């Protein structure tokens, strides 16, 4: 069911979330110009022409939710509605992904975050989704799906299970058939699927992100402390023994990669199959459908190797009937087009078009 409508997508990161990375968020005029021009109808038409069937739109809770008033903010909602209307015009389905909200701390797995522990922030999280359900109640469930949160970090291992189920109950007060995605702990790790408490709801699906191993997909990432230190070029397929040695010598980085261990000696399709076996088991044993909301390779990786990795991942996902959305369409270091709407990774675009056929 899910795979039929959300098979091959691409992310619109940088539009309504992480916009501060691509524009001056301190200038109201500049920010308005960004929202008006970063994603246009022409961009959506292009995405459709490339053969994608959906987009994932990250939205920022700081931008969209007025905590004092307990309501969604009009202007950001207007930008989102406009984009969704363009998508409908070109036959593109939509995932609305709550990418960030007050109280969340990305990757914080040592201490419970305020989002997990504060009653006020937990209430706000659930109220955000209640308001979204109210706003989009009449929209076709097969055309628009809610993703409860982007990459959750819950040091307790159980508070997220409680919070996400509560958010679903709020949505169901308004819309009993809206399709909903609930992601795994530890920044949507595929290895944490077995720690999700599942709900008895035919319209709730589960999702993960896949960038394994990060040393390949994020190599030389300027935004990563780890990969500003470890700068060794990584191939696919490629040897990983030196990187595993590095992790063993840097415990604060080691704990950020729970799926990597001393036996992870080679970055290849076999490793990918091993890690995705958790997804395969989840689908087979739970009877629930899965979706991968993000995957991709940074633009500093060797192009030929990035092509091999992407081909292997998409092929494996398709064989498991797991829909997927590549990160990212525009800007943010993983892009297909740049800020000027010029294609900057033509080889990867050509591969995606081939895989989309």
Give the role of each language-model region.
Residues 13-39, 68-72, 110, 114-119, ...:
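Acidic/histidine-rich helix-loop elements
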Residues 34-55, 65, 69-100, 107-145, ...:
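An active-site-proximal structural segment forming one wall of the substrate-binding cleft
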Residues 3-6, 116-266, 273-298, 315, ...:
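Active-site region of glycoside hydrolase catalytic domains
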Residues 1-54, 282:
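N-terminal carbohydrate-binding accessory modules
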Residues 301-357:
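Aromatic-rich peripheral "rim/lid" segments of glycoside hydrolase catalytic domains that contact
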Residues 58-60, 98-105, 184-186, 325-333:
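Short, solvent-exposed turn/loop segments enriched in Gly/Ser/Thr/Pro and often Arg
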Residues 33-38, 63-65, 71-74, 152-158, ...:
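Acidic-and-aromatic substrate-binding clefts and catalytic sites of carbohydrate-active enzymes
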Residues 38-60, 278-285, 314-316, 320-325:
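Catalytic domains of carbohydrate-active enzymes, especially glycoside hydrolases
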């Amino acid at each position: 069911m899910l795979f039929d409508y959300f098979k091959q997508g691409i992310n619109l990161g940088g539009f309504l979330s992480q916009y501060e990375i691509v524009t001056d968020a301190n200038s109201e005029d500049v920010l308005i110009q960004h929202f008006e021009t970063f994603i246009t109808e022409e961009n959506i038409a292009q995405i459709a022409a490339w053969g994608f069937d959906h987009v994932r739109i990250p939205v920022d809770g700081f931008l969209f939710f007025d905590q004092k008033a307990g309501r969604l903010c009009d202007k950001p909602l207007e930008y989102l509605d406009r984009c969704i209307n363009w998508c409908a015009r070109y036959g593109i389905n939509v995932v609305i992904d709550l990418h960030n909200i007050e109280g969340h701390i990305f990757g914080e797995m040592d201490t419970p975050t305020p989002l997990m522990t504060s009653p006020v922030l937990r209430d706000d999280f659930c109220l955000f989704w209640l308001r979204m359900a109210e706003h989009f109640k009449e929209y076709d469930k097969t055309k628009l799906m809610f993703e409860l949160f982007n990459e959750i970090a819950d040091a307790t291992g159980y508070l997220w299970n409680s919070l996400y189920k509560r958010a679903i109950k709020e949505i169901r007060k308004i819309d009993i058939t809206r399709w909903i995605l609930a992601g795994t702990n530890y920044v949507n790790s595929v290895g944490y699927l077995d720690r999700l408490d599942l709900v008895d709801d035919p319209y709730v699906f589960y999702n993960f992100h896949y960038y394994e191993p990060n040393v390949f997909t994020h190599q030389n990432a300027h935004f990563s402390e780890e990969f500003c230190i470890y700068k060794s070029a990584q191939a696919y397929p490629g040897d990983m023994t030196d990187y595993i040695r590095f992790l063993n010598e840097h415990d604060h980085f080691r704990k950020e990669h729970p799926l990597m261990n001393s036996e992870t000696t080679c970055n290849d399709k076999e490793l990918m199959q091993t890690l995705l076996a958790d997804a395969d088991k989840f689908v087979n044993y739970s009877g629930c459908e899965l979706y991968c909301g993000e995957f991709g390779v940074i633009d500093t990786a060797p192009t030929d190797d990035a092509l091999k990795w992407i081909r292997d991942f998409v092929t494996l996902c398709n064989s498991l009937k797991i829909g997927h959305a590549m990160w990212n369409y525009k800007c943010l270091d993983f892009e297909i087009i740049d800020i000027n709407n010029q294609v900057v990774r033509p080889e990867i675009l050509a591969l995606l078009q081939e895989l989309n056929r």
